[in-house]
């Protein structure tokens, strides 16, 4: 049951799509405070949710701010990253969900100030509070997801492997990447283009020197099973003769200063205006710009810098230059030097600059900071709504850096500018179920790490987790070590682990689609699947993938294995990636186990009484198009028989809901499998 309580006059975020809900007279569970709510926690209480954030699956012990922030240092001391996800579940003596529908800053003090107290602070008394009660943790998530709407469904090829870099500078560099993947039997479905494909960093342009025949090049790549996925940034360059800029100025489609003139900030191209994503006309106009690239054969995009990131606001920059002139005349001691460097550092993403510009919304003129968390959501919404108009029968790939709840209906996310740190493998695992709770099923980290120099073993171990995330993308920053998998010594292991991803695709795609269509979770904490198991509530480095698999990746350097907790008897599945993905299986009882895992191995666990559909002929697969989703191998641990509801479709159209997409597979106690519409062969 979902209950709603309104405070003040909230801005309609359009995050909620559910029908009328009963208004609460009194608030259950929470104590009303002048600036929010509090809840007295018991020692056994666990806090789940809050989407993409630092620290563990259990959010107790830290303070989190819902404030979309451009911050590439994802360390434990941070309180906010790129998104705002105001949904959490308290699980313990009371079990309930909380959603704060508010577009500005919300603080979740999860036992940081007071170890035993959850405090939720809202910047203004204009918001909707939702309390969700359910029969289980998964039921609470299900009800919440029905409230906020169906999760984004990408094309099937978007579940393939993607290779990215800041930046592949021209056509020949992209061709080289594809050729090396193919030469080393490493499947690949997409090459991602960062900012240097553009003409002087201008949105919806292509540099004619680097990509002289872009449409022909996109067709050339698609003929090899490769899609190009270009980046789109939030800022529009101020340049006479640039059509996007001139149209935006002419029609008043940009965010404005208090006096109504277009607000000026600096990002990649220098001085830019920000499209007013909260103005419906401006949003539709910006979305229509994607047609320029769609018409050239592009079928996928990623939206970046859409918190929005601000290198500098023009007015602050002017004041900074003036102050620098004053400092230039001084003998800088330690205090004045610190003030000088601090002044320059405060140019970027300064909170005060977000109070300088305004949006023209359906609900009137709004200062940006009061609706800050909606910008990235509505940039991706602009694209998603345009795709529905321009390509009504076709799925287009879209993922974003910034997001809040509501955006999950229009695209996925990648989890931003992580680092080549071992701790960030574990952080990526922590984020997966928390994002799933909030509706963001299509998500993934930068495999190998974006910042810093990576190592071969780190990339291999990261793929050991990444092959289970819906978005599988290797990405790294300009100036760092190149980390395409074919550049490392152990090419057979990399080829095997990427082929394993494609062997798993029938299961991964089926579980993703069922989660999206049924408002469920593709990835969940162990406690969601095993609610009666007290120890499962404490496990922070294992998750469930779909209904059948438990994964426990290795995330420490030089480790040749790890301890794993199994809540029930399971089948250990060991894949020898360097040996053509040879599979070894053994049954393990419930409890704690030390599991050896060599660098070229992937180990996961199949639940008793469950089935795992796999593709065939991994060595022949170069892209998702080579996977036969109707001709399956079946891995099973089902001494008493089992059944599985398998989903598959054409992977291209938006016609998701047909009953014929669901295929029933059964396995009897004698090991005989049958299916109404798929060919299956039992292997274990």
Region annotations inferred by a language model:
Residues 89-94, 257-259, 567-568:
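Short acidic-glycine loop/turn motifs at beta-strand connectors
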